[in-house]
A protein has these predicted regions:
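Conserved Lys-Pro-Asp/Glu-containing loop-to-beta segment of HAD-superfamily phosphomonoesterases
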Residues: 128-154
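Short, charged, surface-exposed secondary-structure boundary motifs
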Residues: 117-125
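A short glycine-/small-residue-rich loop at the edge of a beta-strand within enzyme catalytic domains
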Residues: 64, 124, 128
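Alpha-helical substrate-recognition element adjacent to the catalytic core
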Residues: 2-118
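Short glycine-rich loop/turn motifs that provide flexible caps or phosphate-binding loops at active sites
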Residues: 9, 123, 150
Length: 154
């Protein structure tokens, strides 16, 4: 069995934080891991901006619900699934990805978890593990799966 691992944002779907930044007019939220490779620094930065602007999960999900997979993404994923076991490895959050996973036919997804307060505000997050994309590939290889990976983080 061969496993194909794909990044999600910028590969199969639009960048969620960029779409949210454009909708809200808050350009600071356009920063991605390409701009700030330390994910913890990037997320603390994002959470601070959200709190300063009194924005939470509901507002982000409203924007996500307007998004669609990139042109050809679903067809490509269907083609790939006929040939490989497909796993999406992403630095996004389950609360963000779910509506888009539905549109992509629910591929296996490994990502992070948000901590949301009762007031809808994002109060933190839990990384699946340190260096999660690389560690997933290492894990698959340790189980003797032939693994390929594609995206801006591999």
């Amino acid at each position: 069995v061969e496993i194909a691992c794909l990044d999600l944002e910028g590969v199969l779907i639009p960048e969620i934080w960029v779409a949210f930044a454009e909708k809200t007019g808050i350009d600071e939220l356009k920063r991605t891991t390409r701009d700030e490779p330390d994910y913890n620094i990037l997320m603390r930065y994002r959470l601070d901006i959200l709190n300063k602007n009194n924005l939470g999960l509901i507002e982000i999900q409203e924007v996500i619900n307007t998004l669609s997979p990139l042109d050809g993404a679903k067809d490509f994923l269907d083609w790939l699934r006929e040939r490989f076991q497909v796993v999406i490895l992403s630095d996004t959050f389950y609360d963000f990805a779910q509506p888009l996973m539905r549109q992509l036919g629910y591929p296996a997804l490994l990502c992070h978890q948000l901590h949301v307060g009762e007031d809808n505000k994002l109060i933190g997050y839990k990384l699946r593990q340190a260096n999660p994309k690389r560690q997933a590939i290492v894990g698959f290889k340790s189980m003797y799966y032939r693994t390929i990976a594609a995206g801006d983080s591999y």
